[in-house]
Curated annotation (Swiss-Prot):
Nucleoside triphosphate pyrophosphatase that hydrolyzes 7-methyl-GTP (m(7)GTP). May have a dual role in cell division arrest and in preventing the incorporation of modified nucleotides into cellular nucleic acids. Its cofactor is a divalent metal cation. This is 7-methyl-GTP pyrophosphatase. SUPFAM superfamilies: ITPase-like. GO terms for cellular component: cytoplasm. The active site is at D73. It comes from Bordetella parapertussis (strain 12822 / ATCC BAA-587 / NCTC 13253). The record marks Y16, Q74, E156 as: Important for substrate specificity. Its main location: cytoplasm.
Amino acid sequence: MPAIPPKLILASSSRYRRELLSRLRLPFTAISPDVDETPQPGEAPADLALRLSVAKAMAVAATHPGSVVIGSDQVATVDGDPIGKPGGFERAREQLRRLSGRAVEFHSAMAVTDGVHTETADIVTLCRFRTLTDAAIDAYLRAEEPYDTAGSAKAESLGIALMDSIRSDDPTAIIGLPLIALTRMLGRFGLDPLTGHPA
């Protein structure tokens, strides 16, 4: 008799991450983690993304023993400086003016845990922004309202029009959940999307 696969939980309130995970056709539940996302003094952007992804996964795993939990976080950087979520129109406009014509790194970190063992990954995406006029920025912000998105650019929707190019080993990383790496990680926890068996 085949073993029953563990319950899968996505520690996220993001509908985009839910949509991405659903592509793998594994049944899952989404639970919003309660985690303080304040950066630590001097913390590197990649370290911040990894720390928060682990914290989110562990926060949910602590109350759901026997489950496999996915935590994720994304941090954007320009010239090594982190670019957070803007929170409102004026800050988003400032961010996009700064990013106009520039190369931006997006660190898409993930943690997968069963509460005992934890695996992590950080997939880097390099985005080159078009040179943006104020009119283009304002039109985008009015249409998209990307105030809860690192760097104010939602590549999964109209934000793709802000880009000149995107380079990554995983095309889903820019949206916040790198499915190629995640598939490998889940297989090691007994959740292979193709076979249902450990990879």
